[in-house]
Amino acid sequence: MKNIYSPSFRSMSRGLALTLGLLLALLLSLPSYAQDGQSKVPINRTISGFTLGVTTPAEARAIIQRQGGKIIAEEGAQNGGDDGGYAFTGFKYARRPTSLITLHFYKGHPRKIAFVFDKLDVLEQIESELENKYGMMAEGKETSKMKSKVIFDAFTFLEVVRRFEYEGHVGFDHAYIAYTDAELDRARLAEKESEI
């Protein structure tokens, strides 16, 4: 049996205590993005030429035309309407074709941009690239016909959403990747709640 009062045992105990103390300090100093859902780097706010919270509807229209896109629906965006927006085609996201892009405005600036895909394998490739860049996404809202994953920073939410034809997540229908300006989204929600 070891004598716990011997000098060699005390130095070993001090070494163990020091090691455990350093390990605890290291764990406590882990960056906050070590948690799922919080981005390890700032999320890009300029996507396909549109900058969340900055680009005006007129600038957005010019970007769409300059890049060869075609506006297929427009609602209130030309007047800077609170919930105006464009739906357009002809753009790629991460070098992959999209079936539709929607750009939603609030107070005359982009609040959200969503890229719609009709192929699940394309979405999964992009999702993997996003997680490599920003970190592990957290499980988001889920219903019987929809699943989502999210990652965020102080200014931007990035969401990957899968929609299904049938309940129980059966029969892939389409998916989208959406970037949302956190401040504009909060302001819009507060305004909507005050109307109730």
Feature locations, PLM:
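Generic cytosolic/nucleocytoplasmic N-terminal low-complexity/intrinsically disordered segments
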Residues: 1-2, 91, 132
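Bacterial N-terminal signal peptides that target proteins for export
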Residues: 2-20
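Bacterial N-terminal signal peptides
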Residues: 17-29
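Sec/Tat signal peptide C-region and signal peptidase I cleavage site
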Residues: 30-34
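Non-cytosolic coordination micro-motifs
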Residues: 35-78, 112-196
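Mid-chain, structured segments of secreted extracytoplasmic proteins
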Residues: 77-124
